[in-house]
């Protein structure tokens, strides 16, 4: 347990950011599952719409510092390949 006032405040801030980051990552994973489900159903229009949303989530995550740029590039590429396989 921290004794210094500023560290106590930092711990609270860190916990809030951690919860926000976990929530964001969860929403990204849900978006990926939606793309995979649309591809499995062979619905190209829906898959493209879901792909756009997933790319948006990845880009926003990179801008916020939640995702590394290589992670974003790798995942965007993999999702695009998946949708283009239709």
From Swiss-Prot:
Q: Which GO terms describe its cellular component?
A: cytosol; small ribosomal subunit
Q: Which family does it belong to?
A: Belongs to the bacterial ribosomal protein bS20 family.
Annotated region (Disordered) at 1-20
Keywords in alphabetical order:
Ribonucleoprotein, Ribosomal protein, RNA-binding, rRNA-binding
Is Chloroplast one of the keywords? no
InterPro entries, A to Z: Ribosomal_bS20, Ribosomal_bS20_sf
- Higher taxonomy: Bacteria, Bacillati, Mycoplasmatota, Mollicutes, Acholeplasmatales
Q: Which organism is it from?
A: Acholeplasma laidlawii (strain PG-8A)
Name the residue ranges with Polar residues bias. Answer: 1-11
State the Gene Ontology BP annotations: translation
MF-aspect GO terms: small ribosomal subunit rRNA binding; structural constituent of ribosome
* Record function comment: Binds directly to 16S ribosomal RNA.
Q: What is this protein called?
A: Small ribosomal subunit protein bS20
């Amino acid at each position: 347990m921290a004794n210094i006032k500023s560290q106590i405040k930092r711990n609270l801030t860190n916990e809030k950011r951690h919860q926000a980051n976990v929530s964001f990552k969860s929403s990204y994973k849900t978006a990926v599952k939606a793309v995979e489900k649309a591809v499995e159903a062979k619905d190209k229009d829906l898959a493209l719409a879901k792909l756009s949303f997933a790319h948006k989530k990845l880009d926003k995550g990179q801008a916020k510092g939640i995702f590394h740029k290589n992670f974003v590039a790798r995942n965007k590429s993999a999702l695009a390949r998946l949708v283009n396989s239709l």
